């Protein structure tokens, strides 16, 4: 078994990081329940990746397998993520699910300690 080499990714790698995370979450049960339509998922997940990756790249804490077969985005303790930037993606959520998604985010905030590292996304290309 080969042990993968993990490297820090730079902002120049943004598209590669977003691509592997998009593939890795393409069959994620929760995200696909939120965005069951493929085109909506791709459009909205791209917005989510753009926003969630900003904090990680600004703090130089994006890690990837050297060939970008997998990547992770980290947020350091004390960093605030502005959930309102995800607002435009809510129009793509089926109407009967919006309230549940909002409740999910509200509940998540209750149990997200401020002094902890946060791993918003980590995934591997399913073909690997």
Segments from the language model and where they lie:
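Short, polar/charged, Gly/Pro-enriched helix-capping and turn/loop motifs at alpha-helix termini
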Residues: 31, 63, 79-81
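Helix-loop element at the rim of GNAT/NAT acetyltransferase active sites that forms part
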Residues: 19-39, 52, 96
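Conserved beta-hairpin
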Residues: 54-73, 123-126
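A structural preference for long, well-packed, hydrophobic secondary-structure segments
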Residues: 16, 126-128
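A short beta-loop-alpha structural element at the N-terminal edge
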Residues: 5-19, 23, 27
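Conserved acyl-donor/pantetheine-binding loop and adjacent beta-alpha core of acyl/acetyltransferases
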Residues: 71-126
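Active-site rim helix/loop that mediates acceptor-substrate recognition in acyltransferases
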Residues: 38-61, 109
């Amino acid at each position: 078994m080969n042990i993968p080499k993990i490297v820090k990714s730079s902002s120049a790698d943004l598209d590669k990081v977003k691509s592997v995370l998009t593939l890795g979450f393409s069959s994620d049960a929760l995200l696909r329940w939120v965005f069951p339509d493929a085109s909506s998922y791709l459009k909205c997940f791209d917005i989510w990746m753009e926003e969630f990756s900003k904090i990680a790249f600004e703090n130089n804490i994006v890690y990837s397998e050297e060939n970008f077969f997998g990547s992770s985005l980290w947020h350091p303790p004390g960093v605030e993520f502005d959930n309102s930037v995800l607002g435009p993606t809510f129009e793509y959520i089926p109407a009967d699910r919006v309230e549940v998604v909002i409740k999910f985010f509200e509940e998540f905030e209750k149990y997200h300690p401020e002094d902890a590292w946060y791993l918003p996304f980590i995934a591997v290309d399913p073909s690997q």
